[in-house]
């Protein structure tokens, strides 16, 4: 997907069900300036394409952070990220120079070899020598063939390895016409319009190994490197597993559990000045259950935003589910009905 990861989970599940190894990634948009910029220098590209693949679970987490930052901080026509973001979240990620819209290829297409070289070396510096690749594609376009020759030379000059891919937008060769019509629907154009978005050549399908070997017979190492990347990528998404953010505990407390206990004790004395033994025992049992189930951070997070809302005059609900009958919830001020 371009700039988003909406389809990752469905793709992951479908691939696993079919016995196919899922390789998770995103074709992101990289701005040459800051992600906070909302204008461009004259003659400067608004963004470039870059392929990012998750090599492992750390890489997958970093990839989601990169994509999220593109929307939160960098959205301007597209969800863009900058080099600062890439450096911050580069671990566990394998990157490639992408298609003709990538920074390296775009410079090569206009005969700016040194600029392309500088860009390639920058990406290698960000992701590491073993984690950045120059990407060859061949969809029968003359400009692509010319750029490929320069990419091969660039690989020789820099030592950055090559890979060979195909930009896939549909499955079978005969699907090109349906894809073209869908593009017209998406962009509000007629098929007969001259000035419209189109994928020339009809070669954006899932090509076989034989076709790829024929296209890139002159650079077999590019295909070998592509296979090596596929072998390296191992992401295991564990569903139905509790994943909660860690709460930042203030100084003076050993851990989240001790902070939750302190807040609960304070609230207990405020809610029940007589401190009835039966309710104290009930609170102790609830705290023990919360700890065993791994919900300590969750209770602190809920307490934090409920407390913030009440302090700022923001209305909150009365609570629902089992938490509405919890003494701890009542003592924390999450609920206001004495259970």
What are these regions (language model features)?
Residues 2-339:
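Phosphodiester-processing cores and adjacent nucleic acid-binding clamps
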């Amino acid at each position: 997907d371009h700039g988003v990861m909406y389809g990752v989970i469905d793709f992951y599940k479908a691939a696993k069900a079919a016995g196919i190894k899922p390789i998770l990634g995103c074709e992101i948009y990289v701005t040459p300036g800051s992600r906070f910029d909302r204008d461009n220098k004259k003659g400067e590209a608004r963004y470039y394409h870059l392929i990012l693949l998750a090599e492992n679970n750390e890489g997958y987490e970093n990839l989601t952070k990169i994509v999220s930052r593109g929307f939160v901080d960098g959205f301007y026509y597209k969800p863009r990220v900058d080099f600062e973001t890439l450096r911050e979240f580069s671990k566990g990620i394998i990157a490639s120079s992408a298609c003709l819209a990538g920074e390296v290829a775009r410079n090569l297409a206009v005969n700016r070899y040194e600029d392309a070289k500088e860009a390639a070396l920058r990406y290698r510096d960000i992701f590491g020598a073993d984690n950045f690749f120059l990407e060859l594609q061949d969809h029968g376009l003359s400009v692509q063939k010319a750029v490929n020759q320069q990419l091969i030379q660039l690989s020789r000059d820099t030592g950055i390895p090559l890979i060979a891919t195909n930009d896939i937008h549909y499955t079978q060769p005969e699907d090109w016409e349906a894809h073209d019509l869908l593009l017209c629907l998406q962009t509000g154009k007629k098929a007969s319009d001259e000035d419209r978005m189109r994928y020339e050549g009809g070669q954006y399908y899932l090509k076989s190994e034989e076709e790829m070997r024929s296209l890139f017979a002159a650079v077999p190492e590019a295909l070998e490197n592509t296979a090596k990347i596929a072998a390296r990528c191992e992401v295991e998404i564990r569903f139905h597993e509790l994943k909660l953010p860690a709460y930042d505990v203030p100084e003076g407390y050993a851990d989240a559990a001790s902070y939750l206990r302190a807040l609960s004790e304070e609230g207990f004395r405020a809610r029940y000045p007589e401190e009835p033994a039966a309710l104290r025992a009930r609170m102790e049992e609830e705290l023990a259950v919360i700890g065993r189930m791994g919900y300590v951070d969750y209770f602190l997070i809920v307490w934090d935003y409920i407390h913030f809302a009440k302090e700022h005059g923001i209305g909150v609900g009365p609570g629902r589910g089992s938490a509405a009958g919890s003494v701890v919830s009542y003592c924390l001020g999450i609920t206001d009905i004495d259970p």
